[in-house]
């Protein structure tokens, strides 16, 4: 299951998952962050239709953080992903609607049905999975989670301490990290996986509608990074989490019980839990090294396979 706030790198994560023979994408649950949950549903349905996978169900999740009444994307996020979340690229709406059931029920039922075979990959806020833990507390011990979020050894990207996904709902991320069995794929490794315009040019040469659309939206993302950050590429944040779900040997992990700061200027910081440092059972692991060259080669192989077919 991918849990997405479907912006540009979420769309890339969908393509990567569909091109991965190790994975079967059984559903997409939607959250907020890059866009509203409503727009994440629309974008997920549209991207799946563009890629010819209208068989994959899409579920609406929570609309805002557990401690908030509403949500709107920040001005910075709108600059990164565009007003529509896809860099202004117009992908036709899918004719099919989201599923009637909600994201939380789908997560809980899927875990019961698939057991240890299921991996849940949240690439936005942790609000949906925290709600699922409340609905079925046994889920925390049973569900394998590979989370895109957090920053253990590097600075955050919304504040000096906090990474964007964790900052959306620090309480939910804290519940996930304190209770779940989680591999955290954070900025420590995702910032090492830069995709450049040499790669998007390869997608354009495929001569397909999907290849062109993905090249256009990713170039928008790369242009933002070049103008605002001064780097000639974009980090493949969400696709790397999907890659780790398929092949954990791509990263080196540090077993460490993590928590999230919930108050003060460091609110949203992911850090080792003081009381958990001496515990032998490390419930969480943080990715601290990545074989970026091997990941990027696999990313291009898998996405070209998917984009070239449509």
Where are these regions (language model features)?
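Generic "edge-of-domain/loop-turn" microfeature
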Residues: 35, 65, 152, 265-267
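Short, mixed-charge, low-aromatic patches
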Residues: 1-4, 60-66, 127-132, 196-201, ...
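Short, surface-exposed amphipathic charged segments that create phosphate/polyanion-binding patches used
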Residues: 72-80, 159-163, 200
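Generic recognition of cysteine residues
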Residues: 30, 64-67, 234
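Hydrophobic aliphatic residue packing
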Residues: 8, 31, 58, 176, ...
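Conformational coupling and interaction surfaces
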Residues: 13-17, 24-25, 167-171, 178, ...
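Active-site histidine-anchored catalytic micro-motif
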Residues: 1-4, 8-46, 54, 84, ...
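Metal-dependent C-N hydrolase catalytic cores
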Residues: 41-113, 282-291, 295-298, 304
């Amino acid at each position: 299951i991918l849990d997405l706030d479907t912006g540009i790198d979420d769309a890339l994560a969908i393509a990567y998952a569909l091109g991965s023979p190790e994975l079967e994408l059984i559903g997409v649950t939607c959250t907020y962050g890059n866009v509203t949950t409503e727009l994440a549903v629309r974008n997920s349905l549209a991207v799946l239709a563009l890629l010819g996978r209208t068989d994959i169900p899409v579920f609406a999740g929570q609309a805002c953080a557990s401690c908030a009444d509403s949500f709107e994307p920040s001005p910075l996020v709108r600059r990164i992903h565009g007003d529509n979340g896809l860099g202004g690229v117009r992908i036709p709406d899918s004719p099919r609607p989201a599923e009637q059931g909600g994201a939380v029920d789908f997560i809980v039922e899927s875990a019961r049905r698939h057991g240890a075979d299921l991996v849940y990959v949240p690439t936005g806020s942790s609000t949906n999975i925290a709600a699922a833990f409340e609905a079925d507390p046994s889920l925390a011990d049973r569900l394998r989670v590979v989370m895109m979020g957090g920053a253990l050894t590097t600075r955050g990207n919304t504040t000096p301490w906090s990474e964007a996904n964790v900052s959306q709902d620090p309480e939910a991320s804290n519940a996930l990290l304190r209770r779940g069995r989680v591999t955290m794929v954070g900025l420590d490794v995702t910032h090492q996986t830069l995709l450049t315009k040499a790669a998007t040019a390869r997608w354009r040469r495929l001569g397909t509608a999907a290849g062109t659309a993905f090249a256009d939206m990713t170039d928008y993302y790369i242009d933002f990074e070049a103008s605002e950050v001064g780097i000639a590429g974009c980090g493949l944040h969400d696709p790397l989490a999907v890659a780790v779900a398929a092949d954990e040997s791509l990263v080196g992990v540090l077993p460490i019980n993590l928590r999230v700061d919930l108050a003060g200027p460091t609110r949203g910081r992911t850090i080792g839990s003081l009381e958990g440092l001496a515990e032998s059972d490390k419930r969480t692991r943080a990715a601290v090294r990545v074989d970026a060259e091997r990941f990027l080669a696999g990313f291009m192989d898998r996405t070209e396979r998917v984009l070239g077919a449509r």
